[in-house]
Each structure stands twice: as structure tokens, then as C-alpha cells.
């Protein structure tokens, strides 16, 4: 591997030419007492800040010294399509040992950032800030703050776990919302209604994080400020999936720019910065003390702080634990039995009505808290579009939290056609969020107007946070060429397929990506990926288990039970099938069933027929449907002309770590059991099986 001493200088300026050399390497970090693999740029996480002045010409060499291909996307930067940095869509991937050269004119100013757009590399450390100064701009007192999230887990393992509906992250965060917790907090009915409507525990975030960082540290310091200074903070949310509440121990926050674009100053007590957004804010240092600018994760599990100034520390207001059952009660009212949201006659948009307020402990206090919303943002200059034909699209953000499927109009990127637009026309997008989570929707290569009631001065953005049940309208002038991604910037939602590709008609293909058909298949591969899940019970009465491979629609599943005696016998079922419907409550499958158990006399099933459950080799077809209370109802018919009906459920949350399972069918088989979660992969378990009897031991879950 190339040694650092042989590297070219990080920064060189020759007139208006600004040249950077970025070196991507694999590295090892230790943030929690455990060494973990990561990826760094020029040896640091976050990557170094890239600084330009409007009118410069950027020349950036990205050298890949890591052990995998990579990419760099210049988030919010207006540039030629071939340099946008999405591997196989706009730009060739940077292969191991390779170098990619980017060059583009700097024709904007503001706060932006850059990050990998390959697999889960952003979560592993590949992100950095970009600062573009205005021409002849007086240098103010300022500081760049890049916020991020960190997990010791391999991000690929996080993604796999989310797709397998693990509640381990809920256990770690204290957001399980079990029946014991519901009873203790007087919300037993709330929990029943929640599961009656086929919902799992509600949360505001998906992943448990070990740390949140301010410029790479849980606490960081900017000491060069004194009493009376007004400090401009350029805040970048470079996290993979965390929204942050921003508040300041020294008083009010004045917002002066969003996503790199200036807005009329807005004074607030706090603001929520969405994943991938940037804000420029002004704060005043009241006295010669050390004031906290704190970013608290939206789920309020942890926070990170940048200390401004020197001397006695002055903390920002702490944000209390969320009242999850109050949120669950609200969500019950908004959710219909068919899984769709009911706005109850409220027309919500622009973050003006935060439905999560019922969960905020501070909401009932006497202090009035001014929180930023998009309706407050007004551009400092007119942003009207040119007079041109307008093409309108309506998008419904959709998803299935139980199976971790995130879509637009119930289709992933790979399932939908490209959206064709023409250069010279205006494009309007009406977006409705029909899911229970917020989504920060990012458009590559363009700024869009957010229609927020400010008329000609509607703010320009490249990321729009859309809350549940909100409808927002954005519009932009189609002035580019090529393919541009519009996607949710929560990394795990994007990789699941929540996005669309806007494609300019008649655009040439970048020859660097090779065969465009093969290249596009690689783009689509992300949301077509199969994820593995396994469960192995090792108990005193035998072993039972499950192995599963599934993606957005399809699933291959094998189940088995092996007793310790001939009387206990063995059985296995293997099914391949497809999930159907928007909520994927229906699963249709085909497969086979092989089993044998030594019995003295044949039994009959509930239909009065000779029961073949103890000696069976059959092919079968069937379906499984999720009923209220998340009970799975199954019906299957086999080549022996036998019908079997079945009811069951796994992982009823009795307490924070205790789970209850049950199953019964018309073959007169039944099972009841408990599982106590010790770690993510190990549980203590016990169950009674009608064929295998009572057993106890451990269950290994992957």
C-alpha cells in the first residue's frame, strides 16, 4: 500500500484553481473500548473540510487505497452529471488502487458536504464538510460543525437486522413498549389497540447508536471566542440515520441559511436538523464562559456537544425521555385497520404540526419554546422559476416497518421506471408521507423551491424533511442532463429502495460506466438484495429452528424440529413464496413437508381425517395472513389432499426482554413457549411442544 510520505499535498491553490488530493483507506478505530473497522479519508473521521470561494474551479483527485470499490457524492453541489458520484448511475466506481479525477466550476456558496454513495460506507466514516465562501465575503467568526452517528456493529449487519425485524435496538434504547411497561404506565388498552391495528412498537429512529459525534468526538471544543462575539456555525448533519435537536446554552439561535442557501434571519429556541441537511446559524457568546451547542438525537438516547468559548461551562437545556405510549396512543388514532394513515381532517405540511409533541416531556411546561419549521424560511432573493411548461408528479411515500420495506407508491427504485423529464421544462413534485416515520428526501444536482407560503421568496433546498401524514410541494427548473437520484437520505431506507431516478430525455450515457444496461442492474441490486435470518433452539427435548432468505417481495424459508427419540421424530418444511399487497400482510407460497414420528396408532385431525402429521412426504401450496394482534393465520393444501389451518405468533413482548410464542393447527399440533433475550444473538428459552414435550435451553438468533 502507498505510504503517506509519498502522497501528494492535500490542498493547493493556483489562482482560482483549487486542487485537493483525498486518500481513502481502511482503518481501525476505538470509540467504545473495542477496536472496530472503519474507513477514513486522509486518515481522519470525519474527512477534512474542503474550502472554496465562489468562482473557483475545483479539481479533486480521489485515491482509493481501501480494499473495496468506493465513490464520492458531492452533496448539494451543482456540477456536471458525470461527476455526481453515484456508482454505475452517473460515475464509474473508484476501484481498489484507482484514482478518480473530478473537476467542476464552483458556481454557488454555502455549507455542503461530501460522502460515499457506495453500500454502507458512509456509516463507516466516509463523510466530510464543504464550505464555499462568497466572493469578497468579510471573514466572520465561524466554525464548521459536522454531526454524525456511530455504531460498533458492521453497518451491513445493522441493515440485515433491520430487515429481520429485530427488536434488539429497541431493547438497547429502552423503547420496547412491552405489555408489562404498558400496564405499569397505564396504557394497557393503548398497547392492545396498537397490536389490534397490526402495528409493532412505534419509534422515531431505527438504529441504536453507541455514540453521536461533533467533528468526530462526543464532546468537542472551539475555544477562540469571547464575550460579545457572534459566531456563525455551519452545521452539517452527516449522520446515516439520526435527526438531531439543536439548542444552545447561551440563548437563542438565529437561522440564516439552510442547505447552503441564505434565508431571512429567523430567531428560534431550537431546531430539528434532518439527516443530510445543513444549517448556518448565529449564536452569541454572552459572557466569557464556555457555552454548549448541543445536538440531541431525536430518540433522545444520547447527545453530542460543541463547547464555544472558555471558562465556566454553561449547558444547554436537556431533553427528557420520550413518552412512547403517548405517541403510540396518537398513532392508534391516526392508523386505519387497512394500514393507511387517517389525517382526521388535518392538512399537515412544512413541519408546522409536529405530531410527536405528545411525546415531549417539555411540551406541558410553562416555558414557550419556539421551534423552527419550514414555513418560517424565506429566501433573501426571488426564486421564481422561468416561464415554461410544468410537469407534475405525485409521490406517496410508503413502507412496511415490520419487514423494513421502504418504497414510493409501493415500488422500490428497481421496480419503478425512470421518470422522464425534458430540459427546459419545470418539474413539480407533490409528496405525501403515508408512513409512520419522517423521511429526508434529497434531490441530486438541483435545488428545488419549497412552496411554503412565501410566494416569490420560497426557500431553495436540496433536502426536504417530510413528517408522517404531511403533504409538501416542491418545484425545480429542469436545466441539467443525465440521470439524477431523488431518495430518502436515511441510509437504510435508501438501500431498501425508497427513491426514484429522474432522467433527462436524450441525454448521452457516461461512457466511463460501461454497458448502461449492466450498470443499471448494479444500481438496482441494492434494493433487490436478499438478507439472511436464522434461529436455532437447543433445548432438553430436542432442537427446532428456522433459516430464511428474503428481500423486498420474495422469501425462501426452511423450518425444522428434531426430537431426541424416535417417538419425538423429526419434521421439516421448506417454502418459497412472495409477499403481496401494500402492507405485505399476505404471503403466498409453495413448498414441501417431510416428517416422521413413530406412533402406535394413527391419529385423526380436527376434520376427522387420518392425520399424516407423523409420516408425511408431500408438496403443498398455501398462504399466510397477518390478522389483528399480529397473529399469523395460515392455510395450506398438500398433494395428499389434506388441508391444514394454523394460528400462531412469535415474540409477543411480555416485558422488555421476555417474549411469548404460541402455535396451534388442525393437525392437533400446538406449542407454547417463552424466550428471554440475553444478548442480540442469545436467549434463554423454554417451550412445550405437543410432539416433543417440555424442554428448556437456549435459542441462538441470527
Description of each model-found segment:
Residues 254-255, 260, 408, 417-418, ...:
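Intrinsic, low-complexity N-terminal interaction/targeting segments
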Residues 85-87, 408, 456, 569-574, ...:
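Outer-membrane beta-barrel translocator domains and adjoining extracellular loop/strand segments
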Residues 672-677, 690-702:
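Outer-membrane beta-barrel "beta-signal"
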Residues 232, 280, 428, 473, ...:
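Membrane-embedded beta-strand positions in outer-membrane beta-barrel channels/transporters
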Residues 1-275, 281, 313-353, 363, ...:
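Histidine-centered copper-binding motifs that mark active-site loops
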Residues 223, 234-238, 243-251, 271, ...:
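A structural feature that tracks compact, well-ordered secondary-structure segments
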Residues 530-540, 553-565, 572-574, 585-596, ...:
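Transmembrane beta-strand segments that form the barrel wall of outer-membrane beta-barrel proteins
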Residues 504-565, 598, 617-621, 670, ...:
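Outer-membrane beta-barrel initiation region
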Amino acid at each position: 500500500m502507498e505510504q503517506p510520505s509519498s502522497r501528494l499535498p492535500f490542498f493547493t491553490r493556483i489562482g482560482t484553481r483549487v486542487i485537493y488530493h483525498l486518500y481513502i483507506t481502511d482503518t481501525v478505530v476505538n470509540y467504545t473500548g473495542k477496536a472496530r473497522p472503519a474507513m477514513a479519508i486522509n486518515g481522519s473521521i470525519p474527512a477534512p473540510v474542503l474550502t472554496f470561494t465562489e468562482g473557483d474551479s475545483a479539481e479533486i483527485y480521489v485515491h482509493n487505497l481501501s480494499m473495496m470499490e468506493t465513490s464520492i457524492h458531492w452533496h448539494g453541489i451543482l456540477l456536471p452529471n458525470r461527476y455526481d458520484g453515484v456508482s454505475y448511475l452517473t460515475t464509474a466506481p473508484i476501484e481498489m488502487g484507482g484514482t478518480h479525477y473530478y473537476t467542476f466550476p464552483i458556481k454557488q456558496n454555502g455549507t455542503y458536504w461530501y460522502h460515499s454513495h457506495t453500500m454502507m460506507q458512509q456509516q463507516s466514516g466516509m463523510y466530510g464538510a464543504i464550505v464555499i465562501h462568497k466572493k469578497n465575503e468579510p471573514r466572520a467568526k465561524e466554525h464548521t460543525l459536522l454531526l454524525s452517528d456511530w455504531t460498533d456493529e458492521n453497518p451491513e449487519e445493522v441493515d440485515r437486522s433491520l430487515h429481520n425485524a429485530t427488536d434488539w435496538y429497541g431493547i438497547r434504547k429502552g423503547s420496547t413498549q412491552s405489555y408489562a411497561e404498558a400496564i405499569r404506565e397505564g396504557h394497557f388498552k393503548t398497547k392492545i389497540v396498537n397490536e389490534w391495528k397490526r402495528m409493532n412498537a412505534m419509534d422515531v429512529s431505527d438504529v441504536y447508536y453507541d455514540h453521536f459525534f461533533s467533528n468526530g468526538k462526543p464532546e468537542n471544543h472551539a475555544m477562540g471566542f469571547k464575550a460579545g462575539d457572534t459566531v456563525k456555525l455551519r452545521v452539517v448533519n452527516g449522520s446515516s440515520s439520526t435527526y438531531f435537536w439543536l439548542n444552545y446554552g447561551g440563548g437563542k439561535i438565529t437561522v440564516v441559511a439552510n442547505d447552503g442557501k441564505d434565508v431571512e434571519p429567523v430567531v428560534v429556541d431550537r431546531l430539528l436538523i434532518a439527516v443530510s441537511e445543513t444549517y448556518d446559524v448565529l449564536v452569541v457568546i454572552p459572557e466569557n464562559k464556555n457555552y454548549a451547542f448541543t445536538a440531541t438525537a431525536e430518540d433522545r438516547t444520547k447527545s453530542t456537544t460543541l463547547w464555544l468559548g472558555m471558562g465556566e461551562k454553561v449547558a444547554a437545556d436537556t431533553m427528557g425521555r420520550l413518552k412512547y405510549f403517548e405517541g403510540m396512543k396518537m398513532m392508534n388514532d391516526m392508523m386505519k385497520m387497512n394500514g393507511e394513515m387517517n389525517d382526521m381532517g388535518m392538512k399537515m405540511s412544512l413541519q408546522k404540526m409536529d405530531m410527536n409533541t405528545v411525546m415531549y416531556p417539555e411540551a406541558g411546561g410553562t416555558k414557550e419554546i419556539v421551534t423552527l419549521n419550514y414555513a418560517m424560511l424565506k429566501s433573501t432573493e426571488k426564486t421564481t422559476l422561468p416561464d415554461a411548461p410544468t410537469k407534475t408528479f405525485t409521490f406517496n411515500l410508503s413502507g412496511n416497518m415490520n419487514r423494513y420495506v421502504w418504497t414510493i407508491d409501493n415500488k422500490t427504485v428497481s421496480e419503478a421506471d425512470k421518470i422522464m423529464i425534458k430540459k427546459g421544462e419545470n418539474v413539480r413534485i407533490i409528496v405525501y408521507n403515508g408512513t409512520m416515520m419522517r423521511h429526508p428526501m434529497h434531490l441530486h444536482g438541483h435545488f428545488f423551491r419549497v412552496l411554503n407560503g412565501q410566494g416569490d421568496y420560497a426557500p431553495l433546498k436540496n433536502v426536504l424533511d417530510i413528517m408522517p401524514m404531511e403533504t409538501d410541494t416542491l418545484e425545480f427548473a429542469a436545466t441539467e442532463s443525465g440521470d439524477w437520484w431523488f431518495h430518502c437520505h436515511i441510509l437504510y431506507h435508501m438501500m431498501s429502495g425508497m427513491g426514484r431516478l429522474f432522467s433527462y430525455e436524450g441525454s448521452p450515457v457516461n461512457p466511463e460506466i460501461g454497458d448502461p444496461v449492466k450498470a443499471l442492474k448494479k444500481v438496482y441490486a441494492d434494493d433487490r438484495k436478499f438478507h439472511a435470518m436464522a434461529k436455532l433452539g437447543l433445548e432438553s427435548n430436542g432442537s427446532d429452528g428456522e433459516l430464511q432468505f428474503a428481500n423486498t417481495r420474495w422469501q425462501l424459508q426452511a423450518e425444522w424440529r428434531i426430537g431426541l427419540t424416535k417417538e419425538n421424530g423429526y419434521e421439516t418444511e421448506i417454502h418459497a413464496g412472495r409477499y403481496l399487497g401494500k402492507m405485505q400482510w399476505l404471503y403466498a407460497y409453495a413448498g414441501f413437508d417431510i416428517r416422521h414420528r413413530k406412533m402406535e396408532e394413527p391419529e385423526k385431525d380436527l376434520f376427522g381425517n387420518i392425520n399424516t402429521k407423523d409420516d408425511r412426504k408431500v408438496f403443498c401450496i398455501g398462504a399466510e395472513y397477518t390478522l389483528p394482534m399480529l397473529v399469523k393465520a395460515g392455510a395450506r393444501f398438500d398433494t395428499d389432499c389434506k388441508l391444514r389451518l394454523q394460528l400462531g405468533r412469535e415474540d409477543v413482548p411480555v416485558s422488555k426482554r421476555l417474549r411469548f410464542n404460541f402455535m396451534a393447527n388442525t393437525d392437533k399440533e400446538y406449542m407454547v413457549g417463552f424466550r428471554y433475550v440475553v444478548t442480540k444473538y442469545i436467549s434463554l428459552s423454554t417451550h412445550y411442544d405437543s410432539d416433543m414435550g417440555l424442554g428448556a435451553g437456549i435459542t441462538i438468533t441470527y
